[in-house]
Amino acid sequence: MPELPEVETTRRGIDTVITGRTLRRLVVREARMRWPIPPALPDLLAGRTVLECGRRGKYLLLRFDHGVQIVHLGMSGSLRRVPEQEAPRKHGHVDWVFDHAVLRLHDPRRFGAVLWHPDEAGPIAAHPLLARLGIEPFDPRFDGRWLHAYFRGRRVAIKQALLAGDAVVGVGNIYASESLFRAGIDPRTAAQRVSAARCDRLAAAIRATLSDALDSGGSTLRDYVGASGEPGAYFAIHAAVYERAGLPCRVCGAPIRRLVQGQRATYFCPSCQKR
């Protein structure tokens, strides 16, 4: 699934292309996404100008003068610029057509979303998909004290607490494993047992891991590409544990282990990461 670095890389890639530009038309070839695309949406947006291209967690937020379009890339989606004359291939479900550019949403599994939040419905932050999201990892308020306060009384394993997204957003499966490795924390540790000092290390590790991923254009394991069609390079360059089961730890040489937590694969070094 595209995580925060992949979504932010996409946002940066399309921001200068569409912000301040008028949408000529929205072409919906397949409306059956995670939630059906509203049939009135093309008419609502035709001829309107994109005022801002934002992001909250893993959601892209395209601000128009009468509302916000919410775009989620789902499990396997990508949003990239394509030549206007390029015929849509299989799974090219939605096009945003501008005078100078076309953006295409490619989503093989159709778990993505293209939704509309009109201004009269209230602030976008109150939308049900966004209202309960945690703090952004690069928000100045996010630190070890924030995590330690959130983890107090939480018996769930630390990795699952990170994936929940209500403490801090955007730390999905890949980056949770990588961040816990950097912080030296066993992913099976109960969240409430992580000390304040270790929470400091974890907050720093999350920021460092996500920064590396952003600098690398995200991670590509299967389907993800950025707005220009380039795959992300983080996994190939930086991954210390993810999908390295049985291979030697890059720090101590012990075999990397794989386990399943909450139906998600977790990778860790049993020597470097302590409970």
Curated annotation (Swiss-Prot):
Keyword terms, alphabetized: DNA damage, DNA repair, DNA-binding, Glycosidase, Hydrolase, Lyase, Metal-binding, Multifunctional enzyme, Zinc, Zinc-finger
FPG-type ZnF: 240-274
Record carries keyword Zinc: yes
UniProt organism field: Bordetella parapertussis (strain 12822 / ATCC BAA-587 / NCTC 13253)
InterPro entries assigned to the protein according to its UniProt record, in alphabetical order: DNA_glyclase/AP_lyase_DNA-bd, DNA_glyclase_Znf_dom_DNA_BS, Formamido-pyr_DNA_Glyclase, FPG_cat, MutM-like_N-ter, Ribosomal_uS13-like_H2TH, Znf_DNA_glyclase/AP_lyase, Znf_FPG/IleRS
Molecular function in Gene Ontology: 8-oxo-7,8-dihydroguanine DNA N-glycosylase activity; class I DNA-(apurinic or apyrimidinic site) endonuclease activity; damaged DNA binding; zinc ion binding
Binding residues annotated for DNA, in chain numbering: 91, 109, 154
Gene Ontology biological process terms from the UniProt entry: base-excision repair
Catalyzed reactions: Hydrolysis of DNA containing ring-opened 7-methylguanine residues, releasing 2,6-diamino-4-hydroxy-5-(N-methyl)formamidopyrimidine; 2'-deoxyribonucleotide-(2'-deoxyribose 5'-phosphate)-2'-deoxyribonucleotide-DNA = a 3'-end 2'-deoxyribonucleotide-(2,3-dehydro-2,3-deoxyribose 5'-phosphate)-DNA + a 5'-end 5'-phospho-2'-deoxyribonucleoside-DNA + H(+)
Lineage start: Bacteria, Pseudomonadati, Pseudomonadota, Betaproteobacteria, Burkholderiales
Cofactor(s) listed: Zn(2+)
Cofactor mode of binding and number, as noted: Binds 1 zinc ion per subunit.
GN (gene name): mutM
Coiled coil: none
Active site residues per record: 2 (schiff-base intermediate with dna), 3 (proton donor), 58 (proton donor), 264 (proton donor)
E.C. number(s) listed in UniProt: 3.2.2.23, 4.2.99.18
Any one Pfam family match given in the protein's UniProt record, by short name: zf-FPG_IleRS
Taxonomy, superkingdom: Bacteria
Function as written in the Swiss-Prot or TrEMBL entry: Involved in base excision repair of DNA damaged by oxidation or by mutagenic agents. Acts as a DNA glycosylase that recognizes and removes damaged bases. Has a preference for oxidized purines, such as 7,8-dihydro-8-oxoguanine (8-oxoG). Has AP (apurinic/apyrimidinic) lyase activity and introduces nicks in the DNA strand. Cleaves the DNA backbone by beta-delta elimination to generate a single-strand break at the site of the removed base with both 3'- and 5'-phosphates.
Protein name: Formamidopyrimidine-DNA glycosylase
Cysteines paired by S-S bonds: none
